Amino acid sequence: MKKNSQIRAKIIELREKIEKWNHHYYQLQNPLVDDLVYDKTLRELEKLERENFFLFSLEELNQSPSQKVGSKITSKFEKVAHSSPMLSLNKAYSNEELEKWAKKASEILKTVTFFVEPKIDGIALSLFYQNGNLIKALTRGDGVFGENVLVNALKINDEFIPKKINYLEDLEVRGEIYIDNSTFASLQLETKKFKNPRNAASGILRRYKNHKPKIDAKSIKFLEEESDFRYLKSFFYTLVNPEKHKINSQFDSINFLRNLGFQVNPFQKKCSDLKDVFNFISIIKQKRDFLNYNIDGVVVKVNEFSIYEKLGSTSKFPHSAIAFKFEDDIAKTKLLAIFATIGRTGKVTYNAKIEPVTLAGSKISSAILPNYSYIENLKLNLNTEVYIKKAGEIIPQIIGSVHNYPKTNFSIVKNCPKCNSELVNSESGLDQFCQNQFCPEIILQKIVHFCSKNALNIESLAQKRIEKFLEKGLISSACDIFYLKDKLELIYERLSNKNQLLTKQNASQSMQIKSIMKLLNEVERAKNIDFYRLIFGLGIRNVGLKAAKILSRYASNLSELRNLDFNLLKNQHDFGPVIIESLIDYFNNQKNSEQLNCLETVGFNFKTTFLTNQSNSWASFAISGKLSKPRDEYVRIIEESGASFHESLTKKTDFLLLGQSAGSKIEKAKKAGIKIINEVQFFDLIKNSKKT
């Protein structure tokens, strides 16, 4: 009896934990744990409930989160019943589990086929059309009732949420709203309030505004938030009641949706059998790190709709589809220590030392912890077991504790680990900064960034050599690098070891001095760079490579950049108030002004690869499909030719560069009269543009 009591208590504890996680995930857009930790806990609950169902009444079993979808709706949006339940998907974690699921379909239909596509980590949305017009947009909610977020769906770009379609029958389609990774990175420059792309997509889609304020100074924040809807994208994958539209398979329904102008994932396949399914899953798994959106597995569906009714469903998921989850990139290890490091902007990053463990083929001994709030939320404890995940990151992340603890036993770092200055919290309260401009670590990291590949690309000045130059008093700022040539005697003297005095006469025989001469040659070459590289190298907070390229269109040298009215850029090219404020703060800082004064004396010969005004660009390009080179390479070529690039098709788009497995852009380009070109034609255009 005592054992039963303990098991019941354990099940109740797991239920409460999952209910809390569901509320934070679905309603607050603030996930407390990683999906892999959530799935492990839910599976543990399901197993315990299966084996000990007799400990609960039928009503208690039905109220378990293992039997429900989503979370209770608590928002201010209108609550609307779904035409048919918006169910979740059952999960398979191994080939054996997938085979077991597929066996039931094979028993009903001997020649069953399957449809496979990536499982997008986004926000489920159901759209309703009458007479070709969008009239309703429901979130998943609790699976039975959803929130009608039509007012927000109407603000999303037509390419991703069609407001009008060429189909007059009543139609309901379901899909996923998401933010791609590169867009999320840009969004993070403007606000740090979103933890991940899914969190951002949910926060924007479910943003509630009960009125539109007057257009005055106080409404600026409202207008900025309204523009966030441009970040949202979509993939649609479900046609509700397909037989009503004479659609008999998932493959046909995807083509139907594509022809109506809905975004569908181009990375999908109709598979003839399970062997074909497993092969395609392997391909998706290999390529997922190269996708520009997050996936947490694949969805496998029975292709033939004719057997869906016989397959049936539970209250939580249908038997006609299953999610195959990737789980091999999570491991268990021991958290040995946590320590803080300082970056070039003074931002504090917490780092974890862990017991070495093999993960995704690599031996891992460290992990990243973004900030102290992350440590607090996960309730991480030193010398305890933790889960660690690697999904494309160079440095893996700790995603949760194996065991439950009431709080963390690691205290927040209050002083800079290098200069001991008191750390200051950001406005959001999430990040901490060292604001001592003379902090040796900040100075070091600024110079490291200045010399990095995407900035001045001075390979001979790696971090260890920069540390040595700082230690010996040979440099104190990035600009000093350009005057090392005037300090040769001092370099010979201070870099000589105790056993060998280096003089100017015998210096040529020294490998060390040869290395110095190589460095000086690289420094000289660095004077002939694209201006955007220097802007990026300045290390202005929130100004990344993309923003630096845009700034180089408005200024061709440091003097012009310093005199630029940055407020003119507000709400252009994704330049929001955070970037504008960072630019103004940087150029108003006395220490930065001294650095800029020094750099203006260097004698740079900047390449003029970018237009000073984007409105003068000779053409506008968009890209669809897989090309022979990485997409970033084509974007670089486009921009350096003086043309402009856009992720989406617009009225101003002149050319669509088409690769393999192109998506719906091709049909939209044809309708809009946009010229479609291949790679050969593209390079001919670029070549000819340089002649004019």
From Swiss-Prot:
GO terms for biological process: DNA repair; DNA replication. Its EC number is 6.5.1.2. Zn(2+) binds at C416, C419, C434, C439. InterPro entries: BRCT_dom, BRCT_dom_sf, DisA/LigA_HHH, DNA_ligase, DNA_ligase_AS, DNAligase_adenylation, DNAligase_N, NA-bd_OB-fold. NAD(+) binds at D35, L36, V37, Y38, D39, S88, L89, E117, R140, E176, K301, K325. Keywords: DNA damage, DNA repair, DNA replication, Ligase, Magnesium, Manganese, Metal-binding, NAD, Zinc. SUPFAM superfamilies: BRCT domain, DNA ligase/mRNA capping enzyme, catalytic domain, Nucleic acid-binding proteins, RuvA domain 2-like. Residues 611-692 form the BRCT domain. GO terms for molecular function: DNA ligase (NAD+) activity; metal ion binding. It holds the Pfam family DNA_ligase_ZBD. It is an enzyme of class 6 (ligase). Transmembrane segments: none annotated. The active site is at K119. It catalyses: NAD(+) + (deoxyribonucleotide)n-3'-hydroxyl + 5'-phospho-(deoxyribonucleotide)m = (deoxyribonucleotide)n+m + AMP + beta-nicotinamide D-nucleotide. Its cofactor is Mg(2+); Mn(2+). Belongs to the NAD-dependent DNA ligase family. LigA subfamily. DNA ligase that catalyzes the formation of phosphodiester linkages between 5'-phosphoryl and 3'-hydroxyl groups in double-stranded DNA using NAD as a coenzyme and as the energy source for the reaction. It is essential for DNA replication and repair of damaged DNA. This is DNA ligase. It comes from Mesomycoplasma hyopneumoniae (strain J / ATCC 25934 / NCTC 10110) (Mycoplasma hyopneumoniae). The gene is ligA.
